[in-house]
Design a protein with these regions (language model features):
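Long alpha-helical repeat solenoid scaffolds
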Residues: 1-231
Length: 231
């Protein structure tokens, strides 16, 4: 999406003096960036590509910018995951899995999503609207882990189309073995992360049930006390 690429590059150039300058530039143009991102998945992916291309010498700055764009909902977690594990990994035939900033981008995005879910599930009591929001966020978190699983499984097994097309002989070249190993490592990390979050949900549900029971018992005790006073 050429227009999105040009616009994002201009915003980044205006704020190129420092991280604080670029974050201020994003703050001033967040409405227009939101409109650009809302156009399509391709536009959101282009925002990520433009950001990483402009700050290629300092990927840490690019990651901070992407985090800010996630906070403003200009980007979605799904877009970040697809860009990193499907588009970027595909364009590099899996070699992006060995890049530190790509891993950090995915991990930070997952932690942002799971952190939001944890904040919601530990609340002792929720209204109907908040309960609906909590259930929606849990569903979105599980969908995100499923997308990560789908993307990484094919890299880990060597069945990704890009690997098959580039395969030499039996697909046992050093590069292909390396990609499979990285895919397997990524898969272990995020499967473990998914299991941890599911365990947290179970414990949070138990805690909510315990508190609800305590409140119910407290209410019954209070009613009994008032009844005795009336007598």
């Amino acid at each position: 999406v050429a227009s999105t690429d040009v616009f994002v590059t201009c915003v980044l150039h205006v704020g190129s003096k420092s991280l604080s300058h670029v974050l201020a530039a994003i703050e001033r143009t967040k409405d227009r960036l939101a409109d650009a991102g809302a156009a399509s998945d391709a536009a959101r992916s282009q925002i990520i590509s433009a950001t990483l291309a402009y700050w290629s010498a300092h990927p840490g700055v690019a990651l901070s910018i992407i985090e800010k764009l996630l906070n403003y909902s200009i980007l979605t977690p799904e877009t970040v995951i697809n860009w990193a594990l499907v588009a970027r990994a595909g364009n590099t035939r899996g070699e992006a899995l060995a890049t530190a900033y790509v891993y950090e981008m995915v991990f930070n995005t997952v932690m942002k999503v799971t952190g939001r879910v944890r904040q919601l599930v530990v609340k002792p009591s929720l209204g109907a609207e908040e309960t609906e929001t909590r259930d929606r966020e849990i569903k979105a978190m599980r969908a995100l882990f499923a997308a990560i699983e789908d993307a990484l499984a094919s890299w880990a097994t060597g069945s990704k189309d890009e690997m098959i097309e580039a395969s030499e002989g039996e697909g046992n070249s050093e590069g292909e073995r390396m990609v499979r190993r990285w895919g397997q490592r990524w898969l272990r990390v995020f499967r473990r992360r998914a299991a941890i979050e599911e365990a947290f949900l179970v414990e949070a549900e138990k805690e909510r049930a315990r508190r609800a029971e305590e409140q119910a018992q407290g209410g019954e005790t209070e009613v009994e006390g008032l009844t005795q006073m009336d007598v």
